[in-house]
Amino acid sequence: MEAIKGSDVNVPDAVFAWMLDGRGGVKPLENTDVIDEAHPCWLHLNYVHHDSAQWLATTPLLPNNVRDALAGESTRPRVSRFGEGTLITLRCINGSTDERPDQLVAMRVYMDGRLIVSTRQRKVLALDDVVSDLEEGTGPTDCGGWLVDVCDALTDHSSEFIEQLHDKIIDLEDNLLDQQIPPRGFLALLRKQLIVMRRYMAPQRDVYARLASERLPWMSDDQRRRMQDIADRLGRGLDEIDACIARTGVMADEIAQVMQENLARRTYTMSLMAMVFLPSTFLTGLFGVNLGGIPGGGWQFGFSIFCILLVVLIGGVALWLYRSKWL
């Protein structure tokens, strides 16, 4: 591969443009730098910025099909070969506090042995781990190592999010055992997050597996083995997602059953109350007709005796219900 001049990839509004020093560190890219396989360049762009969009549309360093892919609409994770270069689309967890985590962030990467061009619109938090390692001098030394570290960081964030969802499901199951129903929409959001994760992480696992099996010239055998380990780890996370989705289905049925039982219990209670007070209601209505005068209306103890009879009647009905095991 021919060397690239630093001025050819130095975009003014880039998120950052760095050169890997081959020892685990980076330095800012300068126009006089020479980019080759020993000192590759990482150019990270926000494709909605004007200068970045113009560079993506005009640079001769990228194949025509790659230009549109790096600045196009979000797609599912995939990997495509373009001659000596490789286009990779990945998804990562959105950890921003003002947005929902199920809205995964897309990151697109085109790379060969000399150049790494990554684009995004929303911030990719998983890249902070790789950036931190590079700034400390403990990061990747070449393009293959960079890709493995990025995929590892993305998988770490995905695994943490899956674990958080799993913990929520455990808490929800414990609450259901205590007959505590979650707030309206809680289970639906949890299930949606799991389904969205399943939708994007399954093809991303396939991307990792393909990168591990492809004989890319800028990846060593050790890096391919690490990539396969990452694919296997994400596969275990997908198994956990499948189990969680099944458990949410069971919990939805359990919640419906608990709500039905609560409704039946309340209806039963109201029916018993109506049965207890039905005789007393009949008597008070009968005495209140007042067609032939109220019985005992002229006796000073008439009302007291009537109240005592009502209490005895209600007690008798309640006792009968109790002995009949309705109460």
Swiss-Prot record:
User: Transmembrane ranges?
Assistant: 274-294, 301-321
| Record localization | Cell inner membrane
Q: Which CDD domains match?
A: ZntB-like_1
For side Periplasmic, which residue ranges?
295-300
Q: Where this protein primarily resides, as one coarse class?
A: membrane
InterPro entries noted in UniProt:
CorA_cytoplasmic_dom, CorA_TM1_TM2, MgTranspt_CorA/ZnTranspt_ZntB, Zn_transp_ZntB
Q: Which GO terms describe its molecular function?
A: cobalt ion binding; cobalt ion transmembrane transporter activity; magnesium ion binding; magnesium ion transmembrane transporter activity; zinc ion transmembrane transporter activity
Q: What is this protein called?
A: Zinc transport protein ZntB
Q: What is this protein's gene name?
A: zntB
